[in-house]
Amino acid sequence: MTQTIRFFLLVEAATFIIAALIHMGFFVTGYEHRQARVAESVIAGVLFGGLLLSLFMSDWTRNVAIVVQLFALLGTLIGIMTIIVGIGPRTVPDVVYHVAITVVLAVGIAVARSAPADSLQ
C-alpha cells in the first residue's frame, strides 16, 4: 500500500510541474499565466515534499499523504473557482486538467485513508 500511495504523490506532483511549465510557456505557447504557474509550483513542491517525507519516515506515509493531497485538492478547488469567476485561465485544457486532477486527488486521498496505519512500515 505504501508504494501505491507514493505513486499517487509522484504522479500528482509531476502533473502539477508539467502544468506549471506549460503556464511558463514551455512545451506550448499561448497558455502563459503567472498566477497559475506559481500556484501549481507550490502545490507540486508540497506533494514532492510529502513524497520525500514518506521515504524517510515511512510510518508517516498515510497521514502525510492525506494532508498534502488535501492541500493540493484545496488549491485545485481554488483554481476551479478562479476559472468560474473569470480570473484564472479559462482554456479547455485548463478546465480538463482541473477536473481530472480533482478526481485523481480524491482517489489518492481515499487510497491513503483506506490504508491501515500499522501496515505502512
Language model region names:
Residues 1-121:
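Topology signature of small-to-medium multi-pass alpha-helical membrane proteins
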